Amino acid sequence: MENYSDQIAGVDEVGRGALFGPVVAAAVILADATIQQLLDQGMTDSKQLSPRQRLSLNQHIREQAVAYQIGMASVYEIDRLNILQASLLAMRRSVLRLSITPQRCLVDGNQKIPQLPMPQTTLIKGDQSEPAIAAASILAKVWRDQLIIRLDQRYPCYHLASNKGYGSAKHRQALQDLGPTRQHRLSFTPCQVSPLFR
């Protein structure tokens, strides 16, 4: 585990594999004094937590973080750039929007974020080993899930509240029956069906 005496930001993204909606990233700076408290409250990789646990930890992280910020890349940007570059763009935005400039970033995965002014360390499965990355994964996941649930009210036939934009059987069937919406990623093969833009 990294020593957090410096101001180090953990950075992670969610939604890369979804068929619908933006890719969302978060950057989080945690103080040494709060890390153990958050770990004691169950903080870990967001994928290992229930929705209720994520919501509770999301609140604790927001209250206790030195700084945090969300970044997003739109469906248009995903289709124009590709999902990898859009994910890196969302992560870059989250870091650059922080109220405190971190001295270093710990980035989940194996890709460094382009055009950041500070050093970076990439960590595969970093959300399982680094508290600041785990915190970022939780903030990004909760923010994106809440957005998708709101969009489910506009597009109820795609079952977004349950699948969060990922390619469940019901979601794929709705794409076949109804075609994609403006929030579907047309560069993703399952979304390349007609009629377009309901």
Positions of the model-derived regions?
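RNase H-like, Mg2+-dependent phosphodiesterase core
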Residues: 1-198
